[in-house]
A protein has these predicted regions:
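Glycosyltransferases and closely related glycan-assembly transferases
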Residues: 137-146, 205-209, 260-269
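N-terminal helix-turn-helix DNA-binding module of bacterial transcription factors
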Residues: 1-63
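Hinge/beta->alpha junction and helix N-cap segments in small-molecule ligand-binding domains
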Residues: 71-80, 100-108, 130, 161-172, ...
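Alpha-helical recognition/docking segments in bacterial nutrient-uptake
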Residues: 1, 5, 62-175, 179, ...
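Aromatic/hydrophobic pocket-lining residues that form π-stacking "cages" and hydrophobic walls in ligand
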Residues: 6, 41, 86, 173, ...
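Flexible loop/turn connectors
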Residues: 238-327
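Short beta-strand segments enriched in small/hydrophobic residues
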Residues: 17-22, 59-74, 184-191
Length: 327
């Protein structure tokens, strides 16, 4: 079967080969292609099943249209859901993503970073840099990088990043629960040394204070760093915080932990309101409400910072949204 060439696509779309190359391979910035011609070129490429020669495109000075994304392989639903939105929005912008999965290993991240650049990836989104004990290594890896944007504040000063906040949503959640008679608010979160967990801890206490209530550290349980199993962590939370302190309302960000705690509470016939935070579909099955982290807005902001460097003089802040759970 004869291989489809760029010339074949150009002929079907009734445009020049250079115009077709600009749309499909990146081409020179000196070449301008109108919206109607672009549509004809893309339609022709689909009909002919044209495959871009990536190596040739890069050598010719074109844009690979590839975005690299670093993800921690131990990441919970929140990060995986964000990756889905990054991929979906990238596709609408004419880009594809290549994902690097690793955990707690800067050496692997460095190898992937170098390899993906050899493949022509020109921009990266990093969602795997929140390692408190590896800050020196993270700084060394990205010290000279000007093609990386970060999800949450990195340990490198001045680098572009998108920040998220639950403060407003948590404040509204607690206010709504207070109107329904709840008074003792507890939460559970991961290892406190990680900046993202520090932020959750701080914002939860701030939301308590904003509602005129007393902040009580005894109602906050930190999962042991050495234990990863959600069921074991839930049992420890029951033993160390829930049973001794008896909160009447629990904010649990992740649905797996919420399900584990809910199961233990039901077995012991202890009534307690639980509210989630990462909007995982499992919450619906559990009958538990959840905050909306606004994943699409986060992904859009990350891509905007990456693809438009002129927008990097500000830090986008994406606020989670409280959806009244009722009852």
């Amino acid at each position: 079967m004869k291989k489809v060439t760029l010339t074949d696509v150009a002929r079907m779309a009734n445009v020049s080969s250079s115009a077709a190359g600009k749309v499909l391979n990146g081409g020179s910035d000196q070449i301008r292609v109108g919206a109607e011609a672009r549509k004809r070129i893309l339609d022709a490429a689909r009909k002919l099943d044209y495959r871009t020669n990536m190596a040739a495109s890069i050598l010719a000075g074109g844009n690979s249209r590839l975005i690299g994304v670093f993800i921690d392989s131990f990441a919970a639903y929140r990060t995986r859901r964000l990756l889905q939105e990054i991929e979906r929005l990238s596709q609408t912008l004419g880009y594809r993503i290549i994902t690097s999965f690793t955990h707690d290993c800067i050496a692997n991240m460095r190898e992937d970073y170098l390899m993906l650049q050899r493949y022509g990836v020109s921009g990266f989104i990093c969602c795997a840099h929140d390692y408190p004990h590896l800050r020196k290594e993270v700084r060394a890896l990205f010290a000279e990088a000007d093609n990386v944007v970060f999800m949450e504040k990195p340990c490198l000063p001045g680098r572009p990043y998108v920040r998220t906040s639950r403060l407003r949503a948590l404040t509204e959640m607690i206010a709504d629960a207070g109107r329904r008679g709840f008074r003792r608010f507890g939460t559970m979160h991961d290892w406190h040394a990680a900046p993202t967990e520090q932020t959750l801890h701080r914002e939860f206490l701030q939301a308590i204070l904003a509602n005129g209530l007393e902040a009580n550290e005894k109602l906050i349980f930190e999962y042991p760093k050495s234990i990863r199993d959600p069921g074991v962590r839930a049992r420890l939370a029951m033993e160390k915080m829930i049973l001794p302190q008896r909160p009447d309302f629990l904010y649990i960000d992740d649905a797996l932990y919420a399900a584990s705690v809910q199961s233990l509470l039901l077995k012991q016939r202890i009534p307690m309101m639980i509210h989630g935070g990462n909007d995982e579909p499992l919450f619906n099955g559990l009958g538990i409400g959840s905050l909306d982290p606004c994943y699409e807005k986060i992904a859009a902001s990350l891509l905007d910072l990456l693809l438009h460097p002129e927008a990097r003089n500000t830090v986008p802040i994406i606020e989670a949204v409280y959806k009244n759970a009722g009852g």
